[in-house]
């Protein structure tokens, strides 16, 4: 494992060591704390080149200005999964949270045993500032495998903003589902959900969009990932709840496979809890390709004023029905 940066120095954490023929890569060290800016977490080491998972990235250092970025996950070996990204550093006394690290890329053949990209790191939380952005999920290996999920955005406090969720990683070329988008963080303004990753070409689904974060005004749900040639579009994320303002809009559904497959459903709009406010609009359903059903539109969010419903996606050009419109 990589060493941690000294407290008060803002120095980055050390990188994890690479494994040999097989074995897991070493974890990255934590970044050092600092008033002027937290140090970045160290990168995870590469997994053994034949069989081994990448190491996890280190946590970013805390700071009263900006928490350090989490370290990226290590690359998986030939048959190994990518390592998880490190969490972003905490923002203290008005400082903002650091961004989460990206998940590592999966190995070339890892998808054949179900391994894929690493999970993105969570964005750093803040005690009186904006939350950090979640890290992107790692992409799967070149041939096959699932993409890693995006990290959730960090929570912000008081009159600040929750971090946006990280995007899901893309699947391998031939088959594998896209990674789910990370949820938006809580805040005065809720963070937006991350987009779902795109699927492989054959019989795979796009990743679901992340939920919008809860806040005075809700965050927008993430868009669903798109399918390849054969497969289904990912569902759009649900919009965040608005505690004292409007709810967030639902994310749009991903498109279905170009040759065959249904579009993803649009996400439901977030509810608005206070008097006089409006629920979020429902997301639009994803369209199908040549053959398939369009995704249903998302329902509008509840509230004193109902959110507008999303429209259903178009059916296949050769064969397929349009998706149903959402309800108010």
What annotation goes with each model-predicted range?
Residues 1-328:
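Long, compositionally biased tandem-repeat segments
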């Amino acid at each position: 494992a990589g060493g941690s940066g000294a407290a008060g120095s803002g120095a980055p954490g050390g990188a994890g060591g690479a494994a040999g023929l097989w074995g897991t890569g070493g974890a990255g060290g934590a970044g050092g704390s600092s008033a002027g800016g937290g140090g970045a977490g160290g990168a995870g080491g590469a997994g053994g080149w034949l069989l081994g998972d990448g190491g996890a990235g280190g946590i970013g250092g805390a700071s009263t200005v900006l928490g350090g970025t989490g370290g990226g996950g290590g690359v998986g070996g030939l048959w190994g999964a990518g390592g998880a990204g490190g969490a972003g550093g905490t923002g203290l006394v008005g400082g903002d949270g650091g961004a989460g690290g990206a998940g590592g890329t999966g190995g070339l053949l890892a998808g054949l045993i179900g391994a894929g990209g690493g999970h993105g790191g969570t964005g750093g939380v803040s005690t009186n500032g904006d939350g950090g952005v979640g890290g992107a999920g790692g992409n799967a290996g070149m041939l096959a495998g699932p993409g890693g999920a995006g990290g959730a955005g960090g929570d912000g406090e008081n009159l600040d903003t929750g971090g946006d969720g990280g995007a899901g990683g893309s699947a391998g070329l031939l088959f594998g589902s896209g990674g789910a988008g990370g949820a938006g963080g809580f805040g005065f303004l809720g963070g937006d959900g991350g987009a779902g990753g795109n699927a492989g070409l054959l019989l795979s689904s796009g990743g679901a969009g992340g939920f919008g974060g809860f806040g005075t005004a809700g965050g927008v749900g993430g868009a669903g990932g798109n399918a390849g040639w054969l497969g289904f579009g990912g569902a759009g994320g649900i919009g965040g709840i608005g505690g004292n303002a409007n709810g967030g809009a639902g994310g749009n559904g991903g498109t279905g496979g170009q040759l065959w497959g249904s579009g993803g459903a649009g996400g439901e709009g977030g509810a608005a809890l206070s008097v006089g406010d409006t629920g979020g609009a429902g997301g639009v359903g994803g369209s199908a390709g040549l053959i398939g059903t369009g995704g249903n539109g998302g329902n509008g969010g509840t509230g004193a004023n109902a959110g507008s419903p999303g429209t259903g996606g178009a059916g296949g050009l050769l064969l397929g029905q349009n998706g149903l419109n959402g309800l108010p």
